[in-house]
Amino acid sequence: MIQHESRLKVADNSGARELLVIKILGGSKRKTGNIGDIVVAAVKQATPGGVVKKGDVVKAVIVRTKSGARREDGSYIKFDENAAVVINADKSPRGTRIFGPVARELREHDFMKIVSLAPEVL
């Protein structure tokens, strides 16, 4: 569960390293987000020479959460960290590489480009 003010690691090479969640999109009083949800976030740490700079406000999709997500068969998928991928307005990633595994739930939310770039889909 990701909420307002949560810090997320960035799982791509867009230049951002850490994000601070400003808003979870999808409803006026939405409190929490899970895997596959889009958030508006501020870049808190960035690598020099990247596409995204520190202080930029970006949209990102959550790809890993510590709290995990429940699957149809009753199992849960959990990760060691909370991570997101910076995206454009057309839901395509701003970076060209994805680091670490991503959840299969992204396929249901039409993030096929992220799923195809990821080294492992769990």
From Swiss-Prot:
Cysteine pairs bridged by disulfides in the record: none
GO MF term set: large ribosomal subunit rRNA binding; structural constituent of ribosome
PROSITE patterns according to UniProt: RIBOSOMAL_L14
CC terms in the record's Gene Ontology section: cytosolic large ribosomal subunit
Pfam families named in the record: Ribosomal_L14 (PF00238)
GO terms under biological process: translation
Annotated keywords: Ribonucleoprotein, Ribosomal protein, RNA-binding, rRNA-binding
Subunit and interaction comment: Part of the 50S ribosomal subunit. Forms a cluster with proteins L3 and L19. In the 70S ribosome, L14 and L19 interact and together make contacts with the 16S rRNA in bridges B5 and B8.
Function of the protein: Binds to 23S rRNA. Forms part of two intersubunit bridges in the 70S ribosome.
Official protein name in the record: Large ribosomal subunit protein uL14
Originating organism: Lactobacillus gasseri (strain ATCC 33323 / DSM 20243 / BCRC 14619 / CIP 102991 / JCM 1131 / KCTC 3163 / NCIMB 11718 / NCTC 13722 / AM63)
